[in-house]
Swiss-Prot record:
The lineage of its organism: Eukaryota, Metazoa, Ecdysozoa, Arthropoda, Hexapoda. This is Signal peptidase complex subunit 3. Belongs to the SPCS3 family. The keyword Phosphoprotein does not apply. Component of the signal peptidase complex (SPC) composed of a catalytic subunit twr/SEC11 and three accessory subunits Spase12/SPCS1, Spase25/SPCS2 and Spase22-23/SPCS3. The complex induces a local thinning of the ER membrane which is used to measure the length of the signal peptide (SP) h-region of protein substrates. This ensures the selectivity of the complex towards h-regions shorter than 18-20 amino acids.
Length: 179
């Protein structure tokens, strides 16, 4: 006969193997789902100022101010394998110095069970919209889009971009009044 330790080891090893197979099966049940949804983004107010960036240097850089509206329904994304969503609004633009600039302006965490219908009006950005030069003034091709990371119970950590983005332009003159 086998000892108690040998039987215990076999039982624990078998249990862990079954749990690993179940976890993988659970992951497979949601890996091919489409997590995209529509997002309506609109800019309400857009300003650009040329101010010193004391965090990086004393040179003047462009600082953008964007007020936006955001409407989307994320309830269809939640299933048994979605623990939470990490949403973030990104601005993407080109300058003569850089082909691709991406700046995260706003973020939010939505837990399972929270209200996943977003209807925000006149929202200010959560983070500063700094450019590393003077590339915001009169920039006519800035796009805003909503993305999210899905935090699952088991499996991959997908990054998903919403369908629909908003294009806007910065004014040709710097704002002189205080914001």
């Amino acid at each position: 006969m086998h000892t108690v330790l040998t039987r215990g080891n076999a039982t624990v090893a078998y249990t862990l193997s079954v749990l690993a197979c179940l976890t993988f099966s659970c992951f497979l049940s949601t890996v091919f789902l489409d997590y995209r949804t529509d997002a309506n983004i609109n800019t309400v107010r857009v300003l650009v100022k040329n101010v010193p960036d004391y965090g990086a240097s004393r040179e003047k850089h462009d600082l953008g101010f964007v007020t936006f509206d955001l409407q989307t329904n994320l309830t269809g994304i939640f299933n048994w394998n979605v623990k939470q969503l990490f949403l973030y609004l990104t601005a993407e633009y080109q300058t003569p110095a850089n082909q691709l600039n991406q700046v995260v302006l706003w973020d939010k965490i939505i837990l399972r069970g929270d209200n996943a219908v977003l209807d925000f009006k006149n929202m200010n950005t959560k983070y500063y919209f700094w450019d590393d030069g003077n590339g915001l003034k009169d920039n006519r091709n800035v796009s805003l889009y909503l993305s999210w990371n899905i935090i699952p119970n088991a499996g991959l950590l997908p990054s998903v971009q919403a369908t629909g983005k908003h294009l806007f332009k910065f004014p040709a003159d710097y704002a002189t009044s205080s914001i």
